[in-house]
Regions:
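Conserved beta-strand/loop scaffold segments within soluble protein domains that form the structured core
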Residues: 2-225
């Protein structure tokens, strides 16, 4: 409990986002992933979430990832729906990436048109750490993805990518905020949408460079078809 309390709901602020507050209030259990100092996980860890119910259902998922100094790991989170019901899913992921650590985080959604999903990902990076975050939406109803990433130590870098392939009446929003609190950090964002029919997509990316964050490098690209 003391270990979890050190990290849980520290960067996922309940007073800044209503969905995060709702998830924090309603979440009954969650997933804790802890990678100790200098441990390098060679194989990708896959986490599969399957929505299964005989009635309409709301679910609230919570994930806490703690990677200590020099740790390396890759994670693939997959969302699927097994039943033709109305689902409302909220998800909050908090990831702490220690000094010289490396995190690859992939989030894939392939549900159905009755699924409503809001996913908030919060990442905190220490000095010389590396993060590769990829969010992929293939089949859904309405989806809103949010990424808040903050640099706490110099020399860190992140690569944040998104891919959306949607048709019919699918709706997909991606919102990002990269907070350069210290200097000598690099952020790269690339989001691509392929839309057909009545599908709608939106992308809003913000980069905040704090006073004194010298030699910041940031690139943001959004391409659509």
């Amino acid at each position: 409990p003391e270990f979890i309390g050190k990290y849980y709901a520290k960067i996922a602020k309940t007073d800044e986002d209503g969905i995060t507050a709702l998830n924090t209030f309603l979440a009954q259990d969650g997933l804790l992933i802890y990678v100790p100092k200098n441990v390098k996980v060679e194989r990708t860890i896959q986490v599969i979430n399957i929505l299964r119910s005989d009635v309409d259902l709301m679910v609230n998922r919570r994930v806490l990832i703690v990677m200590e100094q020099g740790a390396e790991a890759k994670f693939l989170f997959c969302d699927h729906a097994a039943d033709d019901k109305n689902f409302l899913a909220t998800q909050v992921i908090e990831a702490y990436v220690g000094e010289n650590a490396s995190l690859d985080l992939y989030c894939l959604e392939e549900t159905h048109y009755k699924n409503r999903r809001v996913s908030n990902v919060y990442i905190e990076q220490q000095a010389n750490s590396r993060v590769n975050h990829n969010v992929i939406t293939l089949h859904n109803g309405i989806t809103r993805n949010r990424l808040d990433l903050v640099f706490k130590g110099e020399g860190a870098e992140c690569f944040c990518n998104g891919c959306v392939i949607a048709d019919k009446n699918q709706v997909v929003d991606n919102n990002t905020l990269i907070d350069h609190q210290v200097g000598h950090c690099t952020s790269n964002e690339l989001y691509k949408y392929v839309l057909d029919g009545e599908a709608r997509g939106a992308f809003a990316g913000r980069v905040l460079v704090r006073h004194g964050a010298q030699k910041t490098t940031s690139q943001e690209t959004n391409q659509n078809l």
